[in-house]
Regions:
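Short acidic alpha-helical/loop segments enriched in Asp/Glu that coordinate divalent cations
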Residues: 212-215, 233-244, 260-274
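Small-residue-rich helix-loop
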Residues: 268-289
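GST superfamily/GST-like fold recognition
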Residues: 209-231
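All-alpha helical catalytic cores of prenyl diphosphate-utilizing isoprenoid enzymes
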Residues: 164-173, 180, 184-199
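Inter-helical turn/loop segments and adjacent helix faces that build the functional surface
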Residues: 97-103, 180-185, 207-212, 233-240
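A non-catalytic, amphipathic alpha-helix used as a structural packing/dimerization or gating element
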Residues: 110, 114-117, 189-196, 200, ...
Length: 408
């Protein structure tokens, strides 16, 4: 693949000598949901990079101490700068070094707001199907997952030890699935919901190569996290996608390539890479936004309410910290809410509020006329309240960690 080179092992040693023609180093893994959007962006924009697993010596001895926790993705630039988090990594390429082939943030207000909506939903709103279809289909998935997880182990283990290691790591991930609301009581609703998502996305892709037209934007890249790492690579869900929503599968494949991959949109390989005209939203995209409202609005609303109550109780919380004993901890508790006719409980993570703020900040930057247009579009999709849903402290990122800002 153009721009995706394998490099000599010397680059993975503890000391890396910066070179002007050196690649960027992406610390992540094929099974990682959050690495998926960054890898897609790098490939789609033909950026020279190599992917290194986060169990490498360089990652463990240098990256983890720098960012304060074992987490992926992380990026190391040729001059040695470390950037953690997919949103920050994409911002670096798009805003700072300006390596995007095409703008990933629309300039028109409604399209920009919608791209940030799917940034939030892509990263956080499809976790239930991603975890369910990975960890509740052992007959179809287990051999693949054992093989995938085994390549993350350094040094190489014997087969018996690999199985023990996989049992341990997969056990942790199965517990994580529960914290995202996956359980016997929710399985039927998760599968019904995901089938609806595939149907709606497929209908939209019948006339659009990407979410907002003829080129990918931020929302496309962020949807690639769950749609690639879990839902298209793992055997059980990819079989479902290929059987019931092959257009969605082709979108996933388009999002992994630099070269044009537009067989079903013949004009798009030669036509200008433009977005939908006049800041419009086709009915098929509005239907997808309504799905986001039904699927995720009750959850993020409950999380903000929980966080505000929690923050009110933390009378000694120091601004610039996460208010927890472990500075690298991501969750502040759990809360329950009504979802598709049942009640589920999920972990409350401030990182989600940081993504939500990106949508709200984009809205706040608009003039009154543009804000009215955004509100109208979101109201038509049942999502207007998300524009005003705020915690009493902003979430900030400092030294690669989520921290609370001052009281508002």
């Amino acid at each position: 693949m153009v721009g995706y080179q394998m490099l000599p092992p010397v680059l993975f040693n503890e000391t890396i000598i910066p070179m002007t023609d050196s690649p960027y180093i992406l610390y992540g893994g094929p099974v990682s949901l959050y690495t998926g959007k960054v890898r897609s962006y790098l490939r789609k924009n033909n950026i020279n990079f190599v992917e290194v697993h986060p169990n490498s010596e360089r990652y463990l001895k240098h990256i983890v101490p720098t960012v304060g926790r074992w987490i992926m993705p992380c990026l190391e630039t040729p001059d040695g700068r470390i950037i953690q988090d997919g949103a920050d990594i994409i911002d670096y390429f798009d805003n700072e070094v300006k390596l995007s082939r095409f703008p990933i943030r629309p300039t028109t207000p409604v399209h920009r707001a919608v791209s940030h909506l799917f940034e939030l939903f892509g990263g956080e709103g499809l976790l239930r199907p991603a975890m369910h279809y990975r960890w509740n289909f052992d007959e179809q998935n287990i051999a693949f997952l054992e093989s995938e997880f085994s390549i993350s182990v350094i040094p190489k283990m014997t087969e018996g030890k690999e199985q023990i290691n996989f049992a341990r790591s997969s056990g942790r991930m199965r517990k994580a699935a529960i914290t995202f609301g996956v359980g016997p009581h929710s399985v039927e609703a998760i599968e019904s919901s995901f089938a609806e998502w595939l149907e709606l996305f497929s209908a939209h892709l019948a006339n659009n190569a990407y979410l907002l037209g003829n080129r990918p934007t931020l929302g496309d890249y962020c949807l690639m996290g769950p749609m690639w790492a879990h839902l298209f690579r793992d055997p059980a869900p990819t079989a479902l996608i290929k059987k019931t929503a092959p257009r969605v599968g082709r979108w996933v494949e388009r999002m992994t390539t630099y070269e044009p991959y537009d067989g079903e949109h013949f004009e798009s390989s030669t036509a200008p890479r433009e977005l939908l005209a006049n800041d419009t939203l086709p009915d098929t995209l509005v239907a997808m936004m309504r799905f986001v409202a039904e699927e995720y609005l009750s959850e993020i609303t409950a999380h903000v309410e929980y966080a505000n109550n929690w923050l009110a109780e933390q009378t000694d919380l120091v601004t610039g910290t996460n208010g927890l004993p472990d500075p690298g901890a991501r969750g502040i508790g759990k809360t329950s809410f009504a979802w598709r006719g049942i009640e589920i409980e999920t972990a409350v993570m401030p990182y989600r509020f940081w993504l939500l703020q990106r949508l709200q900040d984009a809205f706040a930057e608009c003039d009154a006329t543009s804000q009215t247009a955004i509100r109208t579009a979101f109201r038509n999709a049942g999502l207007e309240s998300i524009l005003d849903l705020r915690t009493i402290r902003r979430v900030e990122r400092a030294n690669h960690l989520e921290v609370w800002g001052p009281l508002l």
